[in-house]
Amino acid sequence: MSRDDLLSWIPAGHPDEMLVRQVNFERLPEHIAIIMDGNGRWAAQRHLPRVEGHRAGIDAVRDTVETAARLDIKVLTLFAFSIENWKRPATEISTLMMLLKRYLRSELKTLLTNNIKFRVIGRMDELADDIQDELRAAMDRTANDGGMLFNIALNYGGRAEIVDAARRAIESGIRAEDLDERRFATFLYTAGQPDPDLLIRTSGEMRVSNYLLWQIAYAEIYVTETLWPDFRRRHLLEAVLAYQKRERRYGGISIGQARAK
């Protein structure tokens, strides 16, 4: 999508217009991964139950998915529910699952309209049958969409993914001497996808929370104090602009450092 296409979606004179004009569409991250954090604090600041923070977070998901698709991001991965989240109160978990079902039903048309392919990464088979049915229906309906790939990490843990990948590698019969990093990556949930170029975490916390541990080896990390329910198009654009100001080295040295040698 071109800059003009994205600008046509933004009302004339809106502050986001200036941000879009600064974006270099030749240096966009292929894959953006986001840790959606801060729902509970958002609710607490407003003296509301935690579940209201999760409800408000749905609007942030909707805005972020559409913005990323219009930016022509190839892959967007959102961390929705971790393996560790099962430790939370049963009422909160049931609300999260209800909101997930509601989102899929209400937003499926938007996903199809924007040519977005929906996928789940994580131990989906451990979720309730009705949740699995909703997820599979959304994946089936969008399977042929050729636009942005939208991953939701559900019942997900980075260490669990690596363990699951190791098991699949063993089950495949691959010989130990034939297993290298490239081959091992084909057994991950994200096989065939580019690794995240940009990892965004909301709420100001400085940790990766067991998220995409293998894949974020060389990702640029951007942390914003913004709580997830308040995260909007502007915040995603700001993260992309910050990413574009960085020099990715992949363990090497910068051009300036090389010349100094």
What does each model-identified segment do?
Residues M1-K261:
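Flexible, compositionally biased loop and terminal segments
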